[in-house]
Swiss-Prot record:
N6-(pyridoxal phosphate)lysine modifications at: K228
Organism listed in the record: Anoxybacillus flavithermus (strain DSM 21510 / WK1)
Entry cofactors: pyridoxal 5'-phosphate
PROSITE patterns from the UniProt entry: SHMT (PS00096)
Pathway(s) annotated for this protein in UniProt: One-carbon metabolism; tetrahydrofolate interconversion; Amino-acid biosynthesis; glycine biosynthesis; glycine from L-serine: step 1/1
Name assigned to this protein: Serine hydroxymethyltransferase
Subcellular location: Cytoplasm
Family listed: Belongs to the SHMT family.
Keywords, sorted A to Z: Amino-acid biosynthesis, Cytoplasm, One-carbon metabolism, Pyridoxal phosphate, Transferase
A Pfam family it matches: SHMT
Gene that produces this protein: glyA
EC number: 2.1.2.1
Matches recorded under InterPro entries: PyrdxlP-dep_Trfase, PyrdxlP-dep_Trfase_major, PyrdxlP-dep_Trfase_small, Ser_HO-MeTrfase, Ser_HO-MeTrfase-like, Ser_HO-MeTrfase_PLP_BS, SHMT-like_dom
Length: 413
């Protein structure tokens, strides 16, 4: 990854980038929302398209000279529609949060009632957290998971929908390891006359590969990020029925954004093109296979998993059985070369800054080439580190085993 000009002009920024590259190369990345994009995606994002302003949409811009970026955005839109079977796609959102905001602005008024998943049960900030714009602007009613099974309680969702008559029901999560029944959600939404939106940010790559039910046939609106399991650049996207296309486009521009980031949209187009290839299906299947194997291996090591396992790319470890908090576990694992994030678990007695769990995902390690045997080894390393966090000899052993794995699967060389 040559950066000869940058190294000469701004050695401080260059060094920070090199340090981050080394971190990614020498550590095992298990944060469920992160992934490693292809070099083609990075080339598109680092292209001259970063210079071009293009307010508006293809064929309807407020600036001249947009004929080439129009081609790029149209490619991204058409590939998104093809990949997910959608009638309309908007690829301009800068993030998943802004994609969600645009949907809310399209159909909601200040104070309207919305049903969304409790953040501590696996939801997302933009699904009604009181510290987020969503919880401030709208009256969010929370649904959650069953205290025994840790799976979405659809009877509870229905009861709350019937009681509160929401204008919108939101499905999707940032830390839910099980398959979501979109058909059931739509049935509930129809029963109370609500719109139905799905935030598939975490599972978009699995949906694209046919490994998770596609929400597009059921939802009025589907939002997603373009990174995570989709393995594209950091950004957002909205899919919707044609009847809402003009409203959604207007909500993004001029509603909440100005000029789109054309270099990022180019990278989105490349990633969506990659996801349309047959080998992406193999990749996504390997993500799920690795997650299931890692879950089994962790259970064999004596760990407790929220809901007992996983159907997708992520799993949650309940650390209470070994007497650790998520905050401590995250720090211990980081020191031996494994990157995770502390995460609340359902009915967590700890604060969000401490937590009783950690969230683990397999998208990034799968991109790197890790397979089932490596999942077994990762489980063993995690077990050694967390059960012997004060034993420097054991921690050194864990570091050596991490190094052996990362050296076996080089990244960006």
């Amino acid at each position: 990854m040559s950066m000869s000009r940058l190294s000469q002009q701004d050695p401080q920024v260059f060094q920070a980038i090199q340090d981050e590259l080394k971190r990614q190369q020498t550590k095992i990345e298990l944060i469920a929302s992160e992934n490693f994009v292809s070099e083609a995606v990075m080339e598109a994002q680092g292209s001259v398209l970063t210079n071009k302003y293009a307010e508006g949409y293809p064929g309807r811009r407020y600036y001249g000279g947009c004929e080439h970026v129009d081609v790029v955005e149209e490619l991204a839109r058409e590939r998104a529609k093809q990949l997910f079977g959608a009638e309309h796609a908007n690829v301009q959102p800068h993030s998943g949060a802004q994609a969600n905001m645009a949907v809310y602005f399209t159909i909601l008024q200040h104070g309207d009632t919305v049903l969304g998943m409790n953040l501590s049960h696996g939801g997302h900030l933009t699904h009604g957290s009181p510290v987020n714009f969503s919880g401030i602007q709208y009256n969010f009613i929370e649904y959650g998971v069953d205290p025994e099974t840790h799976r979405i309680n659809y009877d509870d969702v229905r009861e709350k929908a019937l009681k509160h008559k929401p204008k919108l029901i939101v499905a999707g999560a940032s830390a839910y390891p099980r398959t979501i029944d979109f058909a059931k959600f739509r049935e509930i939404a129809d029963e109370v006359g609500a719109y139905f939106m799905v935030d598939m940010a975490h599972i978009a790559g699995l949906v694209a590969a046919g490994l998770h039910p596609n929400p597009v046939p059921y939802a009025h609106f589907v939002t997603t990020t373009t990174h995570k399991t989709l393995r594209g650049p950091r950004g957002g996207m909205i899919l919707c029925q044609e009847q809402f296309a003009k409203q959604i486009d207007k909500a993004i521009f001029p509603g909440i954004q100005g000029g789109p980031l054309m270099h990022v949209i180019a990278a989105k187009a490349v990633a969506l093109g990659e996801a349309l290839q047959d080998d992406f299906k193999t990749y996504a299947q390997n993500i799920v296979n690795n997650a299931k194997r890692l879950a089994e291996a962790l259970v064999a090591e004596g760990f407790t998993l929220v809901s007992g396992g996983t159907d997708n790319h992520l799993l949650l470890i309940d650390l209470r059985s070994i007497g650790l908090t998520g905050k401590v576990a995250e720090k211990v694992l980081d020191e031996i070369g494994i990157t995770v994030n502390k995460n609340t678990i359902p009915y967590d007695p700890e604060s969000p800054f401490v937590t009783s769990g950690i969230r683990i995902g397999t998208a990034a390690v799968t991109s790197r080439g890790f397979g089932l045997e490596e999942m077994d080894e990762i489980a063993r390393i995690i077990s050694i580190a967390l059960k012997h966090k004060d034993d420097e000899q054991k921690l050194d052993e864990a570091r050596r085993r991490v190094a052996a794995l990362t050296e076996k699967f080089p990244l960006y060389v």
